[in-house]
Amino acid sequence: MKLSEVIAKYSSQDEFISVLKSEVIKLGTENSDFIYNPGFIGSCSYSGPAYRFEFDDELCDYVQIVVGPECKGCIFGQTMQNMGWDNEEEMPYFGSISTVLLNHGFHDKEIRVFQEVQSNQDSGASWGEAIKQ
């Protein structure tokens, strides 16, 4: 299901935001010690572990190196997957949660707190610490 289809399941954007917030808090509380990006050395993925790019001299190109624990995505990736998001074309996106939601018609003031949670997670905080906003 595309993210737009997940959002459309709710009666309003406000309801979607409310459910997303509740589900992020639930996931962060249930997995409070989980550190998605240990050592602040990688970037966020909505569909897998944290990663970084490293130059491979043999290939003369950058390759993606996994730097986080095996999982199905960052806190927002996992939350939105739990809400039904499974579109393989959309999920590899590496942008911020703010950009994802702005691209779906949400307003900055509604999603500012989500960006703070994602920034905390991406800076090496445990999910329990990341949601304390």
Task: Locate predicted features.
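Negatively charged, low-complexity tracts enriched in Asp/Glu with abundant Ser/Thr
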Residues: 2-56
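Short alpha-helical scaffolding segments that buttress acidic/His motifs in well-ordered protein cores
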Residues: 114-121
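Acidic, low-complexity, intrinsically disordered interaction modules
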Residues: 43-73, 77-105
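Low-complexity intrinsically disordered segments
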Residues: 124, 128-133
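Intrinsic-disorder-associated interaction segments
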Residues: 9-13, 17, 90, 94, ...
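Short runs of predominantly hydrophobic/aromatic residues within well-ordered alpha helices
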Residues: 17, 72-76, 110
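Charged interaction scaffolds used for protein-protein
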Residues: 101, 110-113
